[in-house]
């Protein structure tokens, strides 16, 4: 959205095991799914491709993204928070963003690794929050946040290591 690009592709498996990684495709700033994705599959299967020239541009979107988040959030005091990156993409930008927001992040499993060596990347399953719970308690942190592979799903742990489920966060 920030670049107003005509389309995009993200490699993700979200909270699924690595063998389910695939492409999340967008066109005109909308996700491609259902009939549209089936039409794309048919084009690929038919090998009826248009040819032409194009170009590749590289743009840093992380800095503008962090600036935007910092402009809309105001955290009045430093909070010690343990973050479990789930070995997904959160580790690329998350800890840096939290520091810019004035938080004190303690990182676990923030090294991106698509084989997810530390635990399955679904933070809505209690079994996958064990490391986060232990670290929150060991560090006397105020909060723990676990992320899935593409950082669009979270699991929350309070300062005592208790899981706060989605309906409790409301």
Regions found by a protein language model. Name each.
Residues 1-28:
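Ferredoxin-reductase
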Residues 13-14, 30, 37, 110-111, ...:
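Short, ordered loop/turn segments at secondary-structure junctions
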Residues 16-17, 89, 151-153:
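Glycine-rich nucleotide phosphate-binding loop and flanking beta-alpha elements
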């Amino acid at each position: 959205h920030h670049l107003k690009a005509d389309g995009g592709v993200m490699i993700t498996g979200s909270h699924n095991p690595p063998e389910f990684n695939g492409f999340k495709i967008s066109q005109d700033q909308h996700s491609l799914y259902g009939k549209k994705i089936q039409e794309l599959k048919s084009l690929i299967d038919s090998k009826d491709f248009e040819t032409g020239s194009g170009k590749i541009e590289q743009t840093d979107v992380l800095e503008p993204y962090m600036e935007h988040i910092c402009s809309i959030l105001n955290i009045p005091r430093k909070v010690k928070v343990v973050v479990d990156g789930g070995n997904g993409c959160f580790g690329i930008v998350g800890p840096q963003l939290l520091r810019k927001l004035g938080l004190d992040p303690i990182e676990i499993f923030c090294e991106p690794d698509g084989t997810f060596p530390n635990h399955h990347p679904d933070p809505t399953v209690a079994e996958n929050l064990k490391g986060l719970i232990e670290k929150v308690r060991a560090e006397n942190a105020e909060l723990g946040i676990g992320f899935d592979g593409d950082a669009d799903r979270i699991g929350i742990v309070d300062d005592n290591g208790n899981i706060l489920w989605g309906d409790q966060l409301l």
